[in-house]
């Protein structure tokens, strides 16, 4: 018996508070990258983000941001991550894709305004 994998057309939305928090965090960490865990809910391919978590033991630099995910508590409200790209495009690098966490990865490029937030799936396709 072969199971058919259901394919969702993913959609991402976030509250104004979450958006403002992401942009402020990226601006505060510039010229280094910043990274946050996205908290929210997902249903039928739609991801709704309503909170942010600073990951424990995160490390950032001019061209990297990451955290070990093994010390994270089990929290089903974690739906993905967001990090900044202070220089260059908002497209995910191979390293970004290999460290994908959750359902969505958001990348914010400088100068960190509303139109500078992009969402990606685990295959590197824009959502």
Task: Give names to the regions the model predicted.
Residues 1-78, 86-127:
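Conserved beta-strand-loop surface patch within small alpha/beta domains used
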Residues 81:
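Conserved, mostly hydrophobic/aromatic
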